[in-house]
Regions:
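N-terminal glycine-/charge-rich "phosphate-binding" loop or analogous flexible N-terminal tail
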Residues: 1-43, 143
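Phosphate/diphosphate ligand-binding glycine-rich loop within oxidoreductases
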Residues: 44-116
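Glycine-rich adenosine-cofactor-binding loop
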Residues: 119-140
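Short acidic active-site motifs
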Residues: 32-36, 53-55, 77, 159
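Alpha-helix C-terminal capping/helix-to-coil transition sites in glycosyltransferase folds
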Residues: 41-42, 63, 165-166
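Rossmann-like adenosine-cofactor binding region
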Residues: 53-58, 152-176
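NAD(P)-binding Rossmann-fold cofactor-contacting core
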Residues: 141-157
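Glycine-rich, N-terminal phosphate-binding loop of Rossmann-like dinucleotide-binding domains
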Residues: 7, 50, 71, 172-174
Length: 176
């Protein structure tokens, strides 16, 4: 079996030696720009990042049976095409959520240092999924007031939109 892996997926090469039972699998590591229809003709599995568009132009007339994306989103994947062609796929929701939370907390710290935000101000969190819920926990741990809003979830602590508009800082964690 031939597996094509985007070179930009960190640590993938380090994982392969630990898969000793996979002797009949050949891994080919290509740079993103090298992953084109002709270079994956004989591959059955494809692992990518969000910089590569997964669509008919790439997959047509190949042996691809599975596409795995090492990214939190899947807007680079033509899901209908894959499903219509019985190609399984997956992505990695939440894989970068901790990094995003750290970034937001660091940004708030920067704003505090510049006296643009203080600990008595309130942060509004729009979207209460993987990232929004982790951000709320982190803000609570450091004692920063916050209000969450997510119109798709009916949880008690998710306030109405009018209340969140009063926050000094808004952090959006919603699909684009």
């Amino acid at each position: 079996m031939k597996v094509v892996v985007d070179n930009s997926i960190l640590k993938f090469k380090e994982l392969i030696p630990h898969l000793s039972d996979l002797k009949d699998i050949d891994f080919y590591h290509l740079h993103t720009e090298e992953i084109i229809n002709n270079s994956i003709k004989d591959a059955e599995i494809l692992f990518v990042r969000s910089t590569l568009k997964i669509n008919a132009d790439l997959i047509n007339n190949t042996k691809i049976k599975f596409v795995g994306s090492a990214t939190a989103g899947f807007d680079h994947i033509d899901v209908k095409y894959l499903e219509n062609n019985n190609i399984n796929w997956c992505y990695s929701p939440g894989c970068n959520s901790s990094s995003v939370v750290h970034y937001v907390i660091s940004s708030i710290n920067f704003l505090i240092e510049k006296k643009l935000f203080n600990l008595n101000d309130c942060v509004g969190i729009v979207g209460y999924g993987n990232i929004g819920s982790k951000l709320r926990k982190a803000l609570n741990k450091v004692g920063i007031k916050n209000i969450c809003y997510d119109p798709f979830l009916k949880l008690e602590h998710l306030k109405n939109f009018d209340e969140i508009k009063q926050c000094k800082l808004l952090s959006f964690h919603v699909p684009l």
